């Protein structure tokens, strides 16, 4: 499979359409395979999706209910490998619906993101949750935590949107 992936990525028009790869099979996370993959991605300037699903599985060890109990498809339970292989990185943070449970994980992400941004990397941060109604609040919490460490970060675009006018009553 490695050769198939490398052939695909070699032929991909990376200069006009940057791409990142998310691997899920545990074989890709074994040290020899991970090093080989990361080296090749660096050579090509291809990003690696940094999937962080730890909250999905760690919460149960802290007595919290399984946030994926009603999910049709469970999130991959793979080791986090915070390796940047291109001039950008894509962090896919799968949050726990309990905002407070995310604090430890978010706090640990901040220095990494700071370092990558200081090194001139572009960081794409994709945050979602099995209970998608919680995703906006968790995304805001994550960004506010990062902004607390990096006050020069711009405001989130949705902070600039004027609230809609209140609808007048029809009766």
Residue ranges and their predicted role:
Residues 1-171:
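Residues lining hydrophobic/aromatic ligand-binding pockets adjacent to catalytic sites
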